[in-house]
Design a protein with these regions (language model features):
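Conserved Lys-Pro-Asp/Glu-containing loop-to-beta segment of HAD-superfamily phosphomonoesterases
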Residues: 167-168
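Predominantly soluble domains enriched in secretory-pathway, periplasmic, or organellar proteins
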Residues: 99-101, 117
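Conserved N-terminal beta1-alpha1 strand-loop-helix module at the mouth
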Residues: 1-86, 92-94, 101-104, 108-109, ...
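Carboxylate-rich, divalent-cation-coordinating active-site regions
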Residues: 132
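A short, flexible beta-alpha/helix-coil linker loop
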Residues: 36-37, 137-141
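Short beta->alpha connector loops at strand-helix junctions that form conserved
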Residues: 88-90, 135-138
Length: 168
């Protein structure tokens, strides 16, 4: 199943409301990259921005947390209207517990891996996931060149998801 989820990281920040309105009718999700400058070398949006844009649209919010120790903020991001919260495997000591925390709040849970991380670390987590994101760029900046050598990882993971009968 294909879902369209444009990233607001690519929008004109001075016209964020207008930019969101342009894609709202034609998109399934709105992808919101949250970066803390620690887990990745860039800073993007925080909770106040999500709170503000949530008031402008009822589109499904796909919030991608590229932050250290995301478990500290899951409740707040859920309360602000995130529908799906994706964490990075590498960002926390216990990704399974964070995924359970997200689901316990009634939200969909996603897991992501950086290009250098072996996808097999995700296999025990698949029963806890609604989405798996294999990064095909180094996280932290938009507009990077696609890493074609990540496609075998995507294909292998797809086969494992299918073989396990997971609805991801």
């Amino acid at each position: 199943m294909i879902k369209i989820s444009p990233s607001i990281l690519a929008c004109d920040f001075a016209r964020m409301g207008e930019e969101i309105a342009k894609v709202d009718k034609f998109s399934d999700y709105l992808h919101v990259d949250v970066m803390d400058g620690l887990f990745v070398p860039n800073i993007s949006f925080g909770m106040p921005v999500i709170k503000s844009i949530r008031k402008t649209t009822d589109i499904f919010f796909d919030v991608h947390l590229m932050i250290e120790r995301p478990e500290r903020y899951i409740e707040e991001f859920a309360a602000l209207g995130s529908d799906l919260i994706t964490i990075h495997y590498e960002s926390t000591e216990n990704p399974a517990e964070v995924l359970k925390q997200i689901r316990a709040l009634g939200k969909k849970a996603g897991i992501s891996v950086k290009p250098g991380t072996d996808y097999s670390v995700l296999l025990p987590l698949l029963p806890l996931c609604d989405l798996v994101l294999v990064m095909t760029v180094e996280p932290g900046f938009g507009g990077q060149k696609f890493m074609h050598d990540m496609m075998p990882k995507v294909s292998a993971l797809r086969e494992d998801v299918k073989a396990g009968g997971y609805d991801i």
